[in-house]
Amino acid sequence: MLTKAEGRASLLHILKKLRQLQKSAAYQEAESQCGNDMLKRVQLIYPLVIRAEMNAVTDYGFTASFAGLSKYMHEIYALSGEDKEVERLMSEVRSMIFPELPLPDATAALPL
């Protein structure tokens, strides 16, 4: 089980990896293809983010797999209830994965 200090450190490490990812050509290309389309973000950006997170959690004893990331997230969620800083860092990670997108123009015609 992660300690509070390890939880904070691991989330800071993930944030660093995500910031590096955002500067990469692959991420920027995917982002330019997405625009405000959340479905495209899930298809193109989310896999890049998950891969970066899986690689980051290996430094804290978890495997670079969906199972390892799931176990890590379970432990972080448990810590977030005990530690406000872990909760804040989790929120920051979440906002990097799914940033707020501007609402579509209300006057634009909706596709049928």
Residue ranges and their predicted role:
Residues 1-112:
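Terminal, compositionally biased segments used for targeting/anchoring and flexible tails
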